[in-house]
Regions:
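Mature, function-bearing regions of proteins
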Residues: 1-280
Length: 280
């Protein structure tokens, strides 16, 4: 796959599930690294709005072992208020992006046994011809705050940059910026996906993170696999955040007090950089 390549929006507009892993490496002042298995969803949001029955085995805006609720995203809108998709479409319109009229796919963690925490979700916004128009990285912190990073005119395999303005961890300052890279493989991009998010402070690269996985349609078998292997996915995410925070504190990583949240809900990406740099 070349950096300049556009992938069409995934065909077969049904929910998909990805099984893979999350990685996190802190480079300073002492190296700290972990890799954990995970799973995530890839949802065709416009299809689900028009045909909710396309959700299949996914409990859509209702209770279920594996579920998705619109109110967990964006402005917290329920389906009667237009849902999460209405928030995303309003955001794009406000930012002058009017040609993302194709499918919008959301990569996110589901609710598992009713519990949800979504550190970051990715909205892939396509034109009617299937080409990728924008990506929105929707970030949540443990204080119940949310911020969106709009990556304009992205290309798969190309590094994109955005200034960091939102508090996520007390061990990372709100300064510097992020470097994003998105990759897809296979027919229509439905074999695997890989997202890299690296954070640079004033001294250079500090934290290298990402999530990758192989995709397959969400059906009874893949749902059963997810619930059997990861029954405590959400609680595990929250527990790991606090456990690794304790380890960083023990390693004397600098502690930064939480600043006030940004006054603007959206930060737009700066000019993309090319070529992409590999993660360490």
């Amino acid at each position: 796959m070349t950096p300049a390549m556009h992938l069409a929006a995934p065909a077969g507009n049904v929910p998909h599930i990805g099984f893979g892993h999350v990685w996190h490496t802190r480079l300073r002042p002492r190296r700290h690294r972990f890799i954990v298995p995970t799973f995530f969803l890839l949802l065709p949001m416009r299809t689900l709005r028009e045909r909710p029955e396309a959700a299949g085995v996914l409990a859509l805006n209702r209770a279920g072992a594996l579920s998705f609720r619109d109110a967990d995203h964006g402005g917290g809108k329920n389906p009667r208020q237009g849902g999460a998709l209405a928030w995303l479409e309003t955001l794009l319109q406000a930012e002058g992006i009017t040609d993302a009229q194709g499918e919008i796919w959301l990569q996110c963690y589901p609710r598992v046994l009713g519990y949800s925490f979504k550190p970051v979700s990715f909205w892939y916004c396509h034109r009617q011809d299937g080409s990728l128009r924008a990506i929105v990285a929707e970030v949540n912190n443990t204080f119940g705050e949310r911020h969106a990073y709009l990556l304009d005119a992205p290309q798969y395999g190309q590094e994109l940059r955005a200034r960091k303005v939102f508090h996520v961890s007390p061990f990372c300052p709100v300064e510097g910026g992020y470097r994003f890279e998105f990759k897809r493989s296979g027919a229509q991009g439905l074999h695997s996906t890989r997202v890299r998010i690296d954070f640079d402070d004033a001294q250079g690269p500090l934290v290298l993170t990402g999530v990758a996985g192989r995709l397959q349609p969400l059906d009874a078998a893949s749902r059963r696999r997810a619930l059997w292997h990861y029954p405590l996915l959400t609680l595990g995410v929250i527990a790991r955040i606090h456990w690794h925070a304790l380890l960083l504190w023990a390693k004397r990583a600098p502690f930064h007090r939480k600043p006030a949240p940004p006054t603007q809900p959206v930060t737009r990406s700066s000019t993309p950089s090319t070529p992409s740099k590999p993660s360490l």
